[in-house]
Amino acid sequence: MAAVETRVCETDGCSSEAKLQCPTCIKLGIQGSYFCSQECFKGSWATHKLLHKKAKDEKAKREVCSWTVEGDVNTDPWAGYRYTGKLRPHYPLMPTRPVPSYIQRPDYADHPLGMSESEQALKGTSQIKLLSSEDIEGMRLVCRLAREVLDIAAGMIKAGVTTEEIDHAVHLACIARNCYPSPLNYYNFPKSCCTSVNEVICHGIPDRRPLQEGDIVNVDITLYRNGYHGDLNETFFVGDVDEGARKLVQTTYECLMQAIDAVKPGVRYRELGNIIQKHAQANGFSVVRSYCGHGIHKLFHTAPNVPHYAKNKAVGVMKSGHVFTIEPMICEGGWQDETWPDGWTAVTRDGKRSAQFEHTLLVTDTGCEILTRRLDSSRPHFMSQF
C-alpha cells in the first residue's frame, strides 16, 4: 500500500488516523479509500473490493459509450468475390474495442501480427501437457466464467439483433469478470468472439447484419484469466427454424456428446473422429476436415490435435490431466470449405448450412470432467428453443 497524507480510517467503527491508501483504488482513480492499518484494510476487504468492480465496469462502459457507426452498410466489400451462399458481410466493422490496462493479457494481445510466441515455440510438437492441480483449478475457473459469458450471449439471440451487438455484450462481460477475450487480436482477429451464421462453419466475424428469423448462429467464446484460456461454443436457433436446421443442430450436439462419452485414460485421440463421423453420416451429414479440436490451458491452441473425421492420423493417447476441446463442425452438404477474403470466415463450399458445438474437457482417472458445462441445466440452449 502507498503512503499518503493523514486521513481518517474508512473502516466502519474506526476513527483512527489513516496513512495508507488502497493501491488498486489509486490505479482506478477512486477517491478516498484510506485506512489506518493493514488489519483494518483486510477487515474491510469483503465490501471494499466491490468498489473496484464497480469502477472497472463504469470505466469499460465509458470506453465504448461514444462509439458510433458512420456511413452506409456495405454488403459487398470484396469486388468480384463469388459467395458460396446467401450470407453477406455487413461492413464497415466497428473499431476494435479496447481492453482496460488492468486486465491481464495473453502474449499475442499487443503483438502487431497477433502472434503468440509461446505457441510458436511449441509448434510442431506432439507432446501433451499434464496439468498440475494448480493448473486444473485455473482451468476450472476460467471455463466457468466462459460459460457465464456464453449464457449472456444466448439470452440475446433473436431476430433483429446484430452479431456486432452480441460481440459488444461479450466484450463487456469479459471485462466485468476481469478476463481478456481470447479471440481479440489472436493473429489479428478483430473481435472478442466468433459468430457463425448459416453456411459459416467457424470464425465468423461479428458485424452489422441483423439476425433473421430462421437463421442458425454459432457463438464461440474463449476467455483468458490468470494465465489460462477456457473455450466453448453452441449453435442457436433464431426464432422458428425449418426441420432441416433442427436435425442438423441436434445431430451436431449428439456428435459432440457421443465423443465426450468415450473420453477416458487410454483412448487414442484419433478414435474420436470415428465416433463423430459415424453418427453424422448415419443422419445424412458430413464432417468438416480443415478445423479440429485442440489442447488448451496456458496456450490458446496446442497439442493434442483432435480431428473430428474418421480414419485420421492424430497422435496421442489420453491421460489423466490432459485438457482439450472437442468441437465438431457438421454440414448439410459436403465437408469442403473455403475462406472469405477477410482471411477468417470459413464457409461451406456448396453454401449449405453448418453447425458446431464445443466443450473444454479435463481427462480424469475414470473419464472426463466437462469444464464448460452449464451449471443450471444439463441441456444446451437450443433444446429450450424447440
Swiss-Prot record:
UniProt: Zn(2+) 3 binding residues: D220, D231, E358
Cross-referenced InterPro entries: Creatinase/aminopeptidase-like (IPR036005), Pept_M24 (IPR000994), Pept_M24_MAP (IPR001714), Pept_M24A_MAP1 (IPR002467), Zfn-C6H2 (IPR031615)
Annotated PROSITE patterns: MAP_1, ZF_C6H2
Reaction equation(s) it catalyzes: Release of N-terminal amino acids, preferentially methionine, from peptides and arylamides
Compartments where located: Cytoplasm
Keyword vocabulary terms for this entry: Acetylation, Aminopeptidase, Cytoplasm, Hydrolase, Metal-binding, Protease, Zinc, Zinc-finger
Cellular component, GO annotation: cytosolic ribosome
Amino acids binding a protein: H203, H301
Top-level class of the enzyme under EC nomenclature: hydrolase
GO MF term (any one): initiator methionyl aminopeptidase activity
CDD domains (UniProt xref): MetAP1
EC number(s) on file: 3.4.11.18
Subunit organization: Associates with the 60S ribosomal subunit of the 80S translational complex.
Entry note about domains: The C6H2-type zinc finger recruits ZNG1, promoting zinc cofactor transfer in the peptidase domain of METAP1.
Protein's UniProt name: Methionine aminopeptidase 1
Source organism of the structure: Mus musculus (Mouse)
